[in-house]
Structures are given as structure tokens and as C-alpha cells.
């Protein structure tokens, strides 16, 4: 018969094992990717993936398809297998990766309809990347009939929640009159909200750091460090694109319109409590 003391001991042992396993996963899989030890990362992630860890399965799949240079041979079949296993466990990042794989057509044959199904699964959870994915499908008619109004509504939903790529998409919708009446003031406002996620000084420093990293990249060895920064890379790309589009809009707008747009952007940021990116 189990006593209360025995139950407590068992509980503490279970918690201890769980914490220990998480620490091992962090140091044995994720940290190896961050330190660009790609082959070692594959070996370590495989251990945890075989134990059913969905994050490890997703990372392992990403390593097989996303590691580059150094003579590394990509294995798209293994990549898809591991990521799909994690997705079936309802792991959101894996489900999003499934959508992107079907949309991209590199890891598996392009199938926009399947991409839509996975985006919908993720969007139903309120995931902003999933909502943005649906917006892009409807905006460009990928696997679905073009529906600019639907795209606009999805962009708006995610943009109001602070999703940078969606804020860019919303700004472009206003600029191009896609799903909404053309409004350059609102276009400028939303693009500037996205662009201002990083101040100019930090942006220049980041651009220089990225340029230096690319120039000094050792292509004789496998590279996988970038896989630990995919979310940041997506946001940085959106911010950079927003900055370019603002320069274009400045050529098409009056000083009065620009000032009105800046005021609107400040009002939206204050109302929605938007903050700058912390990377």
C-alpha cells in the first residue's frame, strides 16, 4: 500500500527526471544547433525524437532539410517523416512547418490545398503565423480562389495582435486596394508600425552583423545555426521590406499625408500597446 510519503517521493522523482530530461534536451539538441554543431545535433535530436518529443522531432526534420554547405546531403524524406510525426501530436510549430512545406514544394511536392488545411489547423488555435499563412493564400490565390477581402480580414486580425509580417501585408493591402479601399495614409501607418519594431541604429548594426556573418561563413563545414533563428529571420525580413516600401510611399505622398500617417501610427501603437522587437 502506498503511503503519502511514498507518493510524495515518487512525485518528486518524476519531476526531477522531467527537469533533467528537459535540461539534457536543451544542451544536447537545441544548444548544438545554436553552436552550429550540425552532425552532433542530428545525433542528439534523434535520441529525443525517438522518445516521442515533438520539439525534437521538428528540429530533427528541420536539420535534415535545412542544413546547408559542407557537403551535407539533405534528406527530405526523413525531414517530412519527423515533422509529420510531431504535427500529428498537435505540435503547433510542426503543423506550421507542414503548411510551409506543402506551400513551398521543396521538401514535398507542392500541394496548396494541403497547405491550407494545415494553416487552418494552426489558425484555429489563434496562432498568428497560421492566420498570416491563410491571408497569403487568399491574397495570391494559392490553392484557393483569390479573395482579397478574406485576405484583408486575416491580415487585419493578425496585425492588430502585433504580428509584423501581417502588419506589412495589411499596409500593402491599403496601398494596392486589395480587399479594401485604397488609402495611402493607412498604408504608410501600418508599414511604419512594422518598420519601427527596430530603431534605425539597431537596424544598421544588425545589417552590418548579418553582412559580416555572410562574408565570413565557412561553407566548407555544414551550417545549421540559422535554424535556431527562423522566427527572428522572418520578422527581420518583414521589417526590412516595410522600410523599403515606406521609401516608395514617400515619393507618392504629400508632407501633410505623411504627417497624418505618422500620427495615426502613434495612435494605433498606443491603443494596441505595440512594443519593439527584443532581438
Residue map of PLM features:
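Hydrophobic face of amphipathic alpha-helices that form TPR/SEL1-like repeat modules
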Residues: 28-32, 59-68, 97-104, 133-140, ...
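Short helix-capping/linker turns of helical repeat alpha-solenoids
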Residues: 25, 50-53, 67-70, 88-91, ...
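TPR/TPR-like alpha-solenoid repeats
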Residues: 48, 63, 86, 101, ...
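N-terminal leader/linker segments that initiate helical-solenoid repeat arrays
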Residues: 19-51, 55-62
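Terminal, low-structured helical/coil segments at or just beyond the last alpha-helical repeat
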Residues: 209, 215-279
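Hydrophobic h-region of N-terminal signal peptides that target proteins for export
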Residues: 12-20
Amino acid at each position: 500500500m502506498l503511503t503519502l510519503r511514498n507518493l510524495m517521493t515518487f512525485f518528486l522523482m518524476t519531476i526531477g527526471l522531467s527537469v533533467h530530461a528537459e535540461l539534457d534536451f536543451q544542451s544536447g539538441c537545441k544548444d548544438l544547433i545554436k553552436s552550429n554543431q550540425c552532425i552532433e545535433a542530428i545525433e542528439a535530436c534523434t535520441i529525443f525524437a525517438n522518445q516521442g518529443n515533438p520539439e525534437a522531432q521538428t528540429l530533427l526534420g528541420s536539420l535534415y532539410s535545412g542544413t546547408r554547405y559542407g557537403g551535407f546531403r539533405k534528406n527530405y524524406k526523413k525531414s517530412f517523416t519527423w515533422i509529420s510525426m510531431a504535427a500529428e501530436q498537435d505540435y503547433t510549430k510542426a503543423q506550421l512547418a507542414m503548411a510551409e512545406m506543402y506551400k513551398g514544394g521543396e521538401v514535398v511536392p507542392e500541394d496548396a490545398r494541403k497547405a491550407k488545411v494545415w494553416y487552418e489547423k494552426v489558425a484555429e488555435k489563434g496562432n498568428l503565423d497560421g492566420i498570416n499563412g491563410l491571408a497569403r493564400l487568399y491574397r495570391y490565390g494559392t490553392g484557393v480562389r483569390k479573395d482579397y477581402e478574406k485576405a484583408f480580414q486575416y491580415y487585419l486580425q493578425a496585425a492588430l495582435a502585433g504580428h509584423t509580417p501581417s502588419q506589412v501585408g495589411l499596409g500593402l493591402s491599403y496601398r494596392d486596394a486589395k480587399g479594401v479601399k485604397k488609402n495611402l495614409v493607412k498604408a504608410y501607418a501600418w508599414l511604419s508600425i512594422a518598420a519601427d519594431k527596430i530603431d534605425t541604429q539597431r537596424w544598421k548594426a544588425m545589417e552590418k552583423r548579418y553582412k559580416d556573418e555572410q562574408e565570413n561563413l565557412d561553407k566548407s563545414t555544414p551550417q545549421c545555426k540559422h535554424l535556431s533563428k527562423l522566427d527572428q529571420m522572418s520578422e527581420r525580413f518583414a521589417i526590412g521590406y516595410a522600410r523599403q516600401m515606406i521609401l516608395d510611399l514617400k515619393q507618392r505622398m504629400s508632407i501633410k499625408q505623411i504627417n497624418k500617417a505618422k500620427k495615426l501610427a502613434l495612435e494605433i501603437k498606443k491603443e494596441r500597446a505595440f512594443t519593439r522587437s527584443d532581438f
